[in-house]
Amino acid sequence: MLAADTSRSRAYLQALVRHDLLPSRVLMLPAPSNRLLPGQSDASAARPESAPANCEDDLWSEASFDPTEPLVETLARAGILARALDRDDINDPDVIAEIGACRESVFIYSGYGGTLLGPELLATGKRFLHVHGGYLPDFKGSTTNYYSLLAEDALGASSLFLSREIDSGPVLRRSKFPPPPDRRAIDHVFDAAARSKVLVETLQDYAVSGGWRFALTENVGGSTYFIIHPVLKHIAILSPGVGDSCG
């Protein structure tokens, strides 16, 4: 696993521990300066008073994670082998060399947003399993779940193997989620919880089948979105829809 210490990575790792899907090792990316997107800060936001466990189909079952628990604490408690990398750039030659030297063929990727994996990293032969915060191929790009809320009154998450094109690799699993009971906590809690749910289900399917099964081998079409304007984000947060009763 390649992970930055964000709320997303904290949700992932706690979910993997809870479901006994431990990574063989975790390489931790240090925090860069002035390069964080929503959901990628130090994850100090408080979680909701109660997890929405009664949502339909238990879709928000991973929302009860603790966003204030640092990765190092979760790693130590679970006894997972971990090492902090010296560089924050996933495409740095030293980072690429270290990843290439690992025996693992697949890495769960939970780094900082806004960075595409370069051709040198992809040429190592490793596969990078990423969970995109959006329903593919319809919603590609950044902060897509706010656009999804405005367009469909739903959130999405899709697991895929990364390629050189943004959010365009083959999709293993994708799910839609009802609006969370507290839309103000999307960045630090519910976006991460939706992705964690899809990640866990993707890995559970692999554990059962012994291979990677794809929901969408040709991830084409859809729209690519850019970081949402604060006014539109505010509207998405404050506009309750038909699905908001699950809290």
Q: Model segments located where?
A:
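One-carbon transfer enzymes
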Residues: M1-G247
